[in-house]
Amino acid sequence: MMKFKPNQTRTYDREGFKKRAACLCFRSEQEDEVLLVSSSRYPDQWIVPGGGMEPEEEPGGAAVREVYEEAGVKGKLGRLLGIFENQDRKHRTYVYVLTVTEILEDWEDSVNIGRKREWFKVEDAIKVLQCHKPVHAEYLEKLKLGCSPANGNSTVPSLPDNNALFVTAAQTSGLPSSVR
């Protein structure tokens, strides 16, 4: 299903959730510093770059496109961290890990809307995100709890849509760390 808005097309899955994609953009493969961008609605707040998927677009491609537009970075797309559900906003977001290899001086959102970007230590990013975007903080919490390459745990495999791993705020607390 698709809905058209001026200069954007929104796509939805079978259950009516908006299909989104995002990346946790790391400065290095150690995944200790993450790039956040200023919110377009609240420029003094920080968010994880991401947005709606376009028709026929694969989640990984959408995630790479969104970080290029919003954060002005290119990089090596890594693993799918999970698919996060936001029941309030009716969104499902595919969240990937990306290691930044190129940082543009000027990029689409910096020129058009004055968007900023900044590197944060993961712990600091979680604190910043918990106030304004707790769902985004969950991405980093999940990374810390079981998907970091530094802790020896296995990574979450990419799954086809019909076998997708969905994580909601209510579900994470009771799950073993190997699946959070």
UniProtKB/Swiss-Prot annotation:
Positions contributing to Mg(2+) 2 binding: E66
Record-level GO cellular component terms: cytoplasm; cytosol; nucleus
Gene Ontology biological-process annotations: adenosine 5'-(hexahydrogen pentaphosphate) catabolic process; calcium-mediated signaling; diadenosine hexaphosphate catabolic process; diadenosine pentaphosphate catabolic process; diphosphoinositol polyphosphate metabolic process; intracellular signal transduction
Protein's cellular compartments: Cytoplasm
All residue ranges annotated as the Nudix hydrolase domain in the record: 18-144
CDD domains: NUDIX_DIPP2_like_Nudt4 (cd04666)
Residue numbers binding substrate: R10, K18, K19, R20, S39, S40, R41, R89, K90, H91, R115, K133
InterPro entries in the cross-refs: DDP-like_NUDIX, NUDIX_hydrolase-like_dom_sf, NUDIX_hydrolase_CS, NUDIX_hydrolase_dom
Active site positions: E69 (proton acceptor)
Primary location recorded for the protein, binned into one broad class: cytoplasm
Keyword line: Acetylation, Cytoplasm, Hydrolase, Magnesium, Manganese, Metal-binding, RNA-binding
Cofactor(s) the record lists: Mg(2+); Mn(2+)
Keyword presence, Transcription regulation: no
PANTHER family assigned to the protein according to its UniProt record, in alphabetical order: DIPHOSPHOINOSITOL POLYPHOSPHATE PHOSPHOHYDROLASE, DIPHOSPHOINOSITOL POLYPHOSPHATE PHOSPHOHYDROLASE 2-RELATED
Functional summary from the UniProt entry: Cleaves the beta-phosphate from diphosphoinositol polyphosphates such as PP-InsP5 (diphosphoinositol pentakisphosphate), PP-InsP4 (diphosphoinositol tetrakisphosphate) and [PP]2-InsP4 (bisdiphosphoinositol tetrakisphosphate), suggesting that it may play a role in signal transduction.
Note: the additional CAG codon in the isoform 2 (DIPP2beta) mRNA introduces a single, in-frame amino acid residue (Gln86) into the protein. This insertion engenders the DIPP2beta protein with 2- to 5-fold lower catalytic activity than isoform 1 (DIPP2alpha) for the diphosphoinositol polyphosphates and Ap6A, while granting activity towards the Ap5A.
Protein name: Diphosphoinositol polyphosphate phosphohydrolase 2
Organism the protein comes from: Homo sapiens (Human)
Species classification: Eukaryota, Metazoa, Chordata, Craniata, Vertebrata
Gene name per UniProt: NUDT4
